[in-house]
Amino acid sequence: MADLASHWNAVFAAKDDPQLGWYEADVSQTLKLLDLVPGLAGATVFLPGAGTSLLVDVLLARGARLVLDDISDEALRRLRARLGDREPQPSWLHHDIARPLPPGIPACDAWIDRAVLHFLLTDEEITGYFRNLRALLRPGGHVLLAEFAVSGASRCAGLDVHRYSVAEMAERLGPGFGLVHAEDYTFVNPAGAPRPYVYALFRRQS
């Protein structure tokens, strides 16, 4: 974890939020799919790679109970400072989401990942990620994955990425998950470059 944590700490330390390549001032694309999820108010929502995302503010305003995970303690420090005493207070987790989770993490009703999974490259890392997802997500819960599409960039933030199709997402999740909705989306990053994403919302059936 140390090398990747150092990399991401350096990325966050070097730039203000609006300069980060994945920064979104408008999180409406994610909300478009989350609007298909009933009962987010009061739900427990896990965000791997929460970073400094403005989605956190929106979900808190909607009454969600958040578990915010990131490999970068610098990102979590900045996010804590921004949120201040806002209620409900999130739970905080400084952890590599590809590694086994520590005990005591609450089960969640939704798992929301924008641009995290695609940084995991080895089969061990990807398998570990989905093992954690399945361990935390309740039956009936929802998973939103938003990753670089097959036609997307091959690198981001100085790292190689694994690009995804909806079919591969479904295969990795396994037979207990059903697709609710998926769509392609081109995000224009702060530098003005187009970044093709695939957004997919799944529901856990068992």
Where are these regions (language model features)?
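Short catalytic micro-motifs in class I SAM-dependent methyltransferases
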Residues: 115-119
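Class I (Rossmann-like) S-adenosyl-L-methionine-dependent methyltransferase catalytic domain
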Residues: 1-106, 123-206
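Conserved acidic residues
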Residues: 109
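A conserved beta-strand element that flanks and buttresses the S-adenosyl-L-methionine
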Residues: 112
